[in-house]
From Swiss-Prot:
GO terms for cellular component: extracellular region. Belongs to the scoloptoxin-16 family. The keyword Ribonucleoprotein does not apply. This is U-scoloptoxin(16)-Er11a. Pfam families: SVWC. Residues 1-19 form the signal peptide. SMART domains: SVWC. It comes from Ethmostigmus rubripes (Giant centipede). Keywords: Disulfide bond, Secreted, Signal, Toxin.
Length: 119
């Protein structure tokens, strides 16, 4: 019984590691807690990565333009750009107020010391 359980757990871990590496799109869950957006997460931004947020009309795309890296932020209103470096870690923080689907997230980027190349 123990070996069967270990085999199932091993297969589950392999599946998780494979599924996390598929494609460049990552979805993160959001919650509506007392009428506010609840999402506070650090994630590694790579060039070409797109982040889609379920239950909120937001997406972030890391892109390169004129040798400068940006995170393109699509909100309910209009897209705008946040200047970032390849391999930066972005902290997605909920606004102080806002209900679905009108909530928009702030993006704060900090340097990732082990991932500084701009290739």
């Amino acid at each position: 019984m123990k070996s069967w359980t270990a085999a199932v757990l091993s297969l589950g871990l392999i599946y998780l590691s494979i599924s996390q590496n598929e494609g460049a799109t990552t979805e993160f869950p959001t919650m509506n807690y007392e009428g506010r957006c609840a999402l506070d997460m650090f994630t590694l931004i790579e060039v070409g990565d797109t982040f889609n947020y379920r239950h909120a009309c937001l997406s972030y795309t890391c892109m390169k333009r004129d040798e400068t890296f940006y995170v393109q932020v699509h909100t309910c209103d209009a897209p705008h750009f946040e200047n970032v470096t390849s391999g930066m870690i972005c902290n997605f923080t909920p606004p102080t107020t806002g209900n679905f689907p009108d909530c928009c997230l702030k993006v704060n980027c900090i340097a990732h010391l082990n991932h500084t190349s701009a290739n």
